[in-house]
Each structure stands twice: as C-alpha cells, then as structure tokens.
C-alpha cells in the first residue's frame, strides 16, 4: 500500500507501556488517561499518544506514545501534567506496569 502525498522518513522515540489496573479502578484510570492524553498531545515534541483497553481483559491497558526525540520524552516525564495525572493519580491504581522504549523509522508527513 502506498501512502498518498509526500512522505519523509526519520527516526522517532516510541514508548509502549503495558498496565495492569487494580480491580474496580478501570473507569478512573481511563478518565485520567483521557486527560493525560490531551495534555501530552500538545507537547512540542509529541507526535502521538494513544491508549487501548483490552477486549479480553478490561484491566489490561496499553499506552502507545511517540516523540520526535528521547529528550522530548524526558520533557514529558518532567511535566506538571505527568506528575499529577501519571505519577500521583494513575500509578497508585496500577497492579503492574511495564515500560518499553524503541527507536525506529516511521513515516512523517
């Protein structure tokens, strides 16, 4: 499949976080993630922030983040919205969390 329009390739910094939410906290975590996604998507170095709830196990959430550089991800981690929403409100509601980082090429328009 060919993408329409001009496409250039450049390396990005990608983060995938797998979360296991404490029983009964799914709705609260998803609400906080919605707020965190809105704030993160407008950061200068953010290319994308999406999250998904498993169909088979509603307590399993996958967060997919994409940044221009690793430094942009570091800026995100130091942001006020991440401190409040991520660290203070979401993390205590998780039974487990695994963060994976990747560098790779991807299409940019």
Regions inferred by a protein language model and the residue ranges of each:
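Short, surface-exposed ligand-recognition loops at beta-strand->loop->(often short) alpha-helix junctions
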Residues: 20-27
